[in-house]
Amino acid sequence: MNQRKPANNSLIDNCLTLTGIVTSIVKQSQSPLGIPNYSFWLEHRSNKMEVNLERQVWCKIQVILNGCQFSLITQQIKLGDKVKISGFIHTHKDYNGLSKLVLHTEQIEFIDQEKPNGTLFPSS
């Protein structure tokens, strides 16, 4: 039987940039290793052309921010804020064992807002 070899992970790209409205308050927790974890829900709505037809696009995704570098940024995130998130997608299992797609944040930018420092990136 001919088996397929797994793809080389260095050739697989996983990046997503999504702009939307914050629809929940930021929740904070801590990993067993003591790493701060933050999360909130982002709702995206737009119109896109597909096969010469305009399509209304909508999605709601949980945004995850892991690490101390996000502690100040998350204090500024409020319900209704428009943000641009760049990061990677990953599957999380909830308490019922159901899988859901989440967006792990690498960069966050406030859009059309009077926020200090404009674009906010995690510090290295």
Curated annotation (Swiss-Prot):
Assembly and binders: Homodimer. Interacts with PriA and DnaT. Component of the replication restart primosome. Primosome assembly occurs via a 'hand-off' mechanism. PriA binds to replication forks, subsequently PriB then DnaT bind; DnaT then displaces ssDNA to generate the helicase loading substrate.
InterPro entries: NA-bd_OB-fold, Primosome_PriB/ssb, Prisomal_replication_PriB
Assigned GO CC terms: primosome complex
Keywords: DNA replication, DNA-binding, Primosome
Function text: Involved in the restart of stalled replication forks, which reloads the replicative helicase on sites other than the origin of replication; the PriA-PriB pathway is the major replication restart pathway. During primosome assembly it facilitates complex formation between PriA and DnaT on DNA; stabilizes PriA on DNA. Stimulates the DNA unwinding activity of PriA helicase.
Keyword Ribonucleoprotein found: no
Gene3D superfamilies (alphabetical): Nucleic acid-binding proteins (2.40.50.140)
Ranges of residues in domain SSB: 12-112
Swiss-Prot/TrEMBL GO biological process terms: DNA replication, synthesis of primer
Protein name in the entry: Replication restart protein PriB
Organism this protein belongs to: Haemophilus ducreyi (strain 35000HP / ATCC 700724)
Sequence similarity: Belongs to the PriB family.
Pfam families in the cross-refs: SSB_1
Entry-linked PROSITE patterns: SSB
Gene Ontology MF terms: single-stranded DNA binding
